């Protein structure tokens, strides 16, 4: 693949005021811009302090200029970077000046992500690494940033390439058997093809597990707090966030609209959504709209916490309204979606400690008990909150302390799952070698295509456009 030959320019730093701002120019020949704006040719890969000049030789700003000859640059093309004072007016003046100076060579404003796209097209990085650049910029936690850096350094790509190499080797053995059926030597039997396939499937499962963990770091979890009015949803939001974010009063229906806050638990972003209380008849039109938005949030949630009042629960069991909410939750969410009943306000109920329910009968377990599906808490005192935090992570399969995660995207997970599916089918075909060897080879090819799509070895132009247009301009 070859990048376009038209030179591009953009402000590479974020909008707003700052101590330093950067204008980046990339293309097959940035010499005219360099000589016109900097007044001289620059020594490659050295920072030179000088004035940046307008078209009349007047000073726009003073700063550092750096020139990177091709192919030893970020994009693989010639790159000029001008580092000046980071005011928006100064940066815009400098960018405009570069575009004027480069008019004769067709210099134009870069599109979002175009510098990184050129780096990909010039084989400076693969597609997974290119995506990791954007993920590192957008990382919302330290753990996410570290995982993105590992992917940017090529750890994810290397794991994929190792799998691809093993699939290719196995395909060669299969193709040899198909091409020379008259040979008495059974290539598959001699090379233990089934054993090789089993190894590939095991390693792919490991990469998929790491990618799932990385996807959690990147996307986080959407956790909706649902329940009747005045059961302590806003208090629980405040308890999880460790700050008074939502208004808490004894008046039912205080929360009329969704309140969203992002917190971190073990490096995972949790998007906690406090919602309007659910009840059959809204008090007014505003509350009715709030309840509709609650159900909209529930349908989009990864986990739903259904809060009930501990005192009422102990005295009368689950109310008809809460029972109806349970039924509605089950109907609105995809099968298998986690719904955890949170019994709140245990500080106002008889001393129950850390209690969870099993079946229809309550029983007491330790705070680190096995897989609770109902948790008793006090959002006011904090009792049970740590247990709830651990349960949220357990429900999504988070493995604490895993330093080898890749910051994966949904398309990576889809490609890995599809590759896994093709290898599973190949394993079934391998059991009927004589009758289905050609099908076995085809499933291996399809699995290889899925894996190659992650690094961009086999990728459509439409997908590339979708990925790179989500970058910021200047990157």
From Swiss-Prot:
Xref: InterPro entries: G_TrmE (IPR031168), GTP-bd (IPR006073), GTP-bd_TrmE_N (IPR018948), GTPase_MnmE (IPR004520), MnmE_dom2 (IPR027368), MnmE_helical (IPR025867), P-loop_NTPase (IPR027417), Small_GTP-bd (IPR005225)
Domain TrmE-type G residue range list: 220-397
A single GO molecular function term of this UniProt record: metal ion binding
Transmembrane helix listed as a keyword: no
Keywords carried by this UniProt record: Cytoplasm, GTP-binding, Hydrolase, Magnesium, Metal-binding, Nucleotide-binding, Potassium, tRNA processing
Residues binding Mg(2+): 234, 255
Pfam families hit by this protein: MMR_HSR1, MnmE_helical, TrmE_N
Binding site for GTP: 230-235, 249-255, 274-277, 378-380
SUPFAM superfamilies: P-loop containing nucleoside triphosphate hydrolases, TrmE connector domain
EC class of the enzyme, as a word: hydrolase
One GO CC term on file: cytosol
Annotated cofactor note: Binds 1 potassium ion per subunit.
Enzyme Commission (EC) number: 3.6.-.-
Gene Ontology BP term (one): tRNA wobble uridine modification
Ligand binding (K(+)): 230, 249, 251, 254
Biological function: Exhibits a very high intrinsic GTPase hydrolysis rate. Involved in the addition of a carboxymethylaminomethyl (cmnm) group at the wobble position (U34) of certain tRNAs, forming tRNA-cmnm(5)s(2)U34.
Assembly and oligomerization: Homodimer. Heterotetramer of two MnmE and two MnmG subunits.
Protein name (record): tRNA modification GTPase MnmE
Species this chain originates from: Cupriavidus necator (strain ATCC 17699 / DSM 428 / KCTC 22496 / NCIMB 10442 / H16 / Stanier 337)
Lineage: Bacteria, Pseudomonadati, Pseudomonadota, Betaproteobacteria, Burkholderiales
